[in-house]
Curated annotation (Swiss-Prot):
EC number of this enzyme: 5.1.3.2
Superkingdom of the organism of origin: Bacteria
Positions with a binding annotation for NAD(+): 13-14, 33-38, 53-54, 76-80, 95, 120, 144, 148, 172
Keyword Zinc listed: no
Reaction(s) catalysed (UniProt annotation): UDP-alpha-D-glucose = UDP-alpha-D-galactose
Record-given protein name: UDP-glucose 4-epimerase
Active site: 144 (proton acceptor)
Pathway as given in its UniProt record: Carbohydrate metabolism; galactose metabolism
A Gene Ontology molecular function term of the record: UDP-glucose 4-epimerase activity
Described function: Involved in the metabolism of galactose. Catalyzes the conversion of UDP-galactose (UDP-Gal) to UDP-glucose (UDP-Glc) through a mechanism involving the transient reduction of NAD.
One Gene Ontology term from the biological process aspect of the record: galactose catabolic process via UDP-galactose, Leloir pathway
Keywords: Carbohydrate metabolism, Galactose metabolism, Isomerase, NAD
Assembly description: Homodimer.
Upper taxonomic lineage: Bacteria, Bacillati, Actinomycetota, Actinomycetes, Kitasatosporales
Length: 329
């Protein structure tokens, strides 16, 4: 069933891929992005584009008035750099929390009652056990994770008070290309693309932060393909709305170490990847792996790419876009 959807932050990596999937499924899509990060080139053909900031309440009201009867909103607009959030926490509270507050107000005023929120595993902080289930304690260790958790609490309140039907999807480490289309995180901070930049000669080496974890070598993470992630968002936004806030972790349920990722990049690219050993970064957990049972049960989601083949199509994109996208429209 086709519909009309607003994608905030839809010129960024994940948001642009989700917008593309929505367009290809026959939906009318409006992308909203301020382009402080992200790239205009990432907005898929067939989607309308509004350049503006979700914190601007007048702008948001105009977007909703100009596009009557949005069937739902998929919300990606957020700052997401953990390190920056530690030194500039106010930036994250203002944008991630304040921006979502303005979005919820605009949705309420327009009678839009369906929301999918792009959340993060950072809301859980240091896990007590893995795989991580949705009922796990939420104790974020940085302002970025705290800001996302605050948004989750806001959404829960909105659902109870005003009948919002919402799904939050905390996901873990996303990578890969989507049928040849991949944007870059801006600025890049994720392991797989950083290692691929070493293979391209754009970086001299990859820093490995600690090899003294209680793992076979280095810390272990759950990697999810961006196309699988996009499919989960589409399934979530199609759920029947109601005064409920559902949280569904998205991941493959298995983990790979930093060393395994580096070795895979060496094999796929044929390039040596020099490593620089560095101390652990603060409170980096040894293992972060998701339990996606709720997403499977409630959304009918089944990821189709559960191994490091994710590296191959990411390398294909990086090889054809050696400098990434360099326009901001």
């Amino acid at each position: 069933m086709s519909g009309k959807y607003l994608v905030t932050g839809g010129a960024g990596y994940v948001g642009s891929v989700v917008a593309q999937h929505l367009v290809e499924a026959g939906n009318e899509v409006v992308v909203l992005h301020n382009l402080s990060t992200g790239f205009r080139a990432g907005v898929p053909a067939g989607a309308s584009f509004y350049r503006g900031d979700i914190r601007d309440q007048d702008f948001m009201r105009k977007v909703f008035r100009g596009r009557l009867s949005f069937d739902g909103v998929l919300h990606f607009a957020a700052f997401s750099q953990v390190g920056e959030s530690v030194v500039k926490p106010e930036k994250y509270w203002d944008n991630n929390v304040g921006g979502t507050m303005a979005l919820l107000e605009a949705m309420r005023g327009a009678g839009v009652r369906r929301l999918v929120f792009s959340s993060t595993a950072a809301t859980y902080g240091e896990p007590e056990q893995v795989p991580i289930v949705e009922s796990a304690p939420t104790r974020p260790t940085n302002p970025y994770g705290a800001s996302k958790l605050a948004v989750d609490h806001m959404i829960t309140g909105e659902a109870a008070a005003h009948g919002l039907g919402a799904v939050s999807v905390p996901y873990f480490n996303v990578a890969g290309a989507n049928r040849g289309v991949r944007l870059v995180h801006d600025p890049e901070s994720h392991l797989i693309p950083l290692v691929l930049q070493v293979a391209q000669g754009r970086r001299e080496a990859i820093s490995v932060y600690g090899d003294d974890y209680p793992t076979p070598d280095t810390c272990v993470r759950d990697y999810i393909h961006v196309a699988d992630l996009a499919e989960a968002h589409l399934l979530a936004v199609r759920r029947r709305p109601g005064n409920e806030h559902l949280i569904c972790n998205l991941g493959n349920g298995n983990g790979f170490s930093v060393r395994e990722v580096v070795e895979t990049v060496r094999r796929v690219t044929g390039h040596p990847i020099p490593e620089i050993m560095a101390p652990r970064r603060g409170r980096d957990p040894a293992v972060l792996v998701a339990s996606a049972g709720t997403a499977r049960e409630k959304l009918g989601w089944n990821p189709s790419r559960a191994d490091l083949a994710i590296v191959s199509d990411a390398w294909e994109w990086h090889s054809s876009h050696p400098k990434g996208y360099d326009d901001r429209g």
